[in-house]
Design a protein with these regions (language model features):
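Hydrophobic, membrane-embedded alpha-helices of multi-pass small-molecule transporters
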Residues: 84-101, 238-246, 255-319, 358-367
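Loop-to-transmembrane helix boundary motifs in multi-pass membrane proteins
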Residues: 160-161, 197-201, 307-316, 323-331, ...
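Helix-loop-helix module between adjacent transmembrane segments
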Residues: 46-47, 94, 127-143, 147-212, ...
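Membrane-interface "cap" regions at the ends of multi-pass membrane proteins
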Residues: 33-34, 46-103, 270, 297-300
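Flexible loop linkers connecting adjacent transmembrane helices
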Residues: 56-82, 105-109, 114, 130-159, ...
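Extracellular loop-to-transmembrane helix junctions
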Residues: 37-55, 109-139, 148, 353, ...
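Hydrophobic alpha-helical segments and their helix-loop junctions in multi-pass secondary transporters
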Residues: 175-201, 210-211, 230-258, 443-451, ...
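Extracellular/periplasmic helix-exit of transmembrane alpha-helices
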Residues: 136, 241-252, 299, 306-342, ...
Length: 508
């Protein structure tokens, strides 16, 4: 009787012994398979170490004050400024900055081979997470100031006005891009009467509601749930990468592009534009002020701003590795959404594929609504329109939504319209990071901090964006070495301008 009871107890999946046995077996499999993916495994570890070491160093450089009153209390209006739990802020920040970037961008970027690993790790730790942390913390110190105001304070009023227009355009493009994609996916997986137009209207209506209501009513309640599903999906894929033991390329094999059109898509600078959200994205600096207005303490900035970006980098690394496996097995013919669905269904079954599609649908929607919310706040600050009353919020929001709707109509009427919008969105996204990094550099000089931390990333991203303008087919499309010479000249010009400013500042 005792023997029978023990066997039945062992077979019960809820039994501790069974669970420990399952963990031991799978751990042994994972340990054995690690030899096939050393570069990938080391990259994940480096991202975590980057948060613990360089993130801590960045925090010490900024010197957050735990006793300082934050805008969540000093400007509490019950709409955009209010204290929220730290875990909620982290989840909202993560979902705001993620969107489809660390999934679709990483899948596209995987076509550049092991170079994608290097860019995600180095870019995320030293450029992207640093950019997100300092832009968020400067906003916090400036009373929750939005990005154009921060740029204006440190780069001048003319730059401020240009960046105000540029930022609103970028945010509207984010809203457009992140309406079209989820609507198209929902169109394919729902009944026929729920067509693309139907879902665009539904998503648009949600955008309007989420943009107008106080941040704790919609965003504060549902975003953490969506963030959990996105993280769960990534962890599931990560576990299956290790369990399946897929063979991934190593850096020791050399850095070579596996892009099907590698003749016209060089690793530099195309990859640095393609993989944005997993490494560095200017859009993030428009979102950090939203959460800076809800932080209870300056000390919480590192886990929220730096930590959310590191998590996004890990997610990008996971999807890049999964995509490399997919390209080796199936080739390059499918869309990014189809690749996500195939990988999750193959590795995680029906439940995994459902979670994946939820992530692919809801991640861009949640980035889109906060983008339009940011656009409303920037426009309201410029027009000096108080946003406490919903009627005033509606007055500012309607023109933004009207312009967004017109661009969506264009993207649907022209077969190539969406691709054009996406390419220019990608470049403008990274161009925004250039201005943000230069503003951070000036801030660090003025406040006697080690400004080289921001200066080197600022020069590099200037080089990336300017070279892309000259080399990309949708821009000037110049061949040979000329694009790189011109891009280098632009980067050198930025250094000379900065050096002259330093000289004048020292004289003052």
């Amino acid at each position: 009787m005792l023997k029978k009871y023990s066997v039945q107890k062992y077979k019960n999946p809820y039994n501790l012994c069974y669970c420990l046995h399952w963990i031991f077996i799978n751990f042994a499999i994972v340990k054995k398979n690690l030899k096939k993916m050393i570069t990938f495994s080391v990259s994940i570890i480096l991202l975590i170490v980057g948060y613990l070491v360089y993130g801590k160093f960045a925090e010490r450089v900024f010197k957050p004050d735990s006793n300082a009153a934050t805008p969540a209390y000093t400007k509490n209006d019950g709409v955009d400024y209010m204290p929220l739990p730290t875990w909620k802020i982290f989840m909202i920040q993560f979902l705001n900055i993620a969107g489809l970037g660390p999934i679709f961008g990483a899948i596209l970027g995987a076509q550049f081979g092991t170079a994608a690993y290097i860019w995600i790790v180095v870019g995320c730790i030293f450029i992207g997470a640093f950019h997100d942390y300092f832009s968020g913390m400067i906003s916090l110190r400036e009373g929750g100031a939005n990005l154009p105001d921060i740029i204006g304070k440190y780069l001048g009023n003319t730059t401020k006005q240009v960046m105000r227009v540029f930022t609103v355009i970028l945010l509207v493009l984010v809203g457009v891009v992140f309406v079209s994609q989820p609507a198209g996916i929902l169109d394919r997986i729902t009944p026929e009467w729920m067509n693309n137009t139907f879902w665009i209207i539904v998503i648009f209506a949600y955008y309007l509601i989420a943009t107008l209501l106080p941040i704790d009513k919609v965003i504060g309640k549902i975003y953490p749930l969506f963030a959990f599903s996105l993280i769960f999906m990534a962890l599931g894929v990560l576990f299956m990468i290790f369990k399946q033991g897929i063979s991934l390329p190593e850096i020791t094999d050399g850095i070579a592009s596996i892009h099907p059109q590698k003749e016209v898509t060089p690793i530099f600078p195309i990859m640095c534009i393609t993989i944005a959200c997993g490494a560095i994205s200017g859009f993030h600096a428009t979102q950090s002020p939203l959460m800076a207005r809800c932080l209870k303490n300056e000390k919480l900035g590192r886990p929220v701003f730096y930590g959310a970006m590191i998590l996004e980098g890990i997610m990008a690394m996971i999807w890049a590795a999964a995509a490399i496996w997919y390209y080796k097995e199936k080739g390059y013919g499918e869309t990014q959404a189809s690749i996500v669905y195939f990988i999750t269904e193959t590795w995680m079954g029906k439940v995994g594929s459902v979670l994946a599609m939820l992530g692919v649908v809801f991640a861009p929607i949640t980035s889109g609504d906060t983008a339009l919310r940011s656009a409303r706040l920037i426009l309201a600050d410029f027009l000096k329109i108080d946003q406490t009353k919903i009627s005033k919020r509606l007055m500012v929001s309607l023109p933004i939504f009207a312009i967004t709707a017109l661009i969506i109509v264009y993207s649907l009427s022209d077969a190539a319209g969406f691709n054009v919008i996406w390419r220019y969105f990608g470049w403008s996204n990274q161009a925004l990071s250039v201005f943000t990094l230069w503003a951070i550099t000036v801030y660090m000089v003025i406040n006697h901090k080690p400004w080289v931390m921001a200066f080197v990333p600022a020069v590099y991203m200037t080089l990336v964006c300017s070279t892309y303008l000259f080399v990309a087919p949708e821009c000037f499309g110049l061949g040979g070495s000329l694009p790189y010479i011109l891009g280098g000249a632009c980067a050198c010009a930025s250094i000379i301008i900065f050096a002259n400013w330093i000289k004048k500042d020292n004289q003052r």
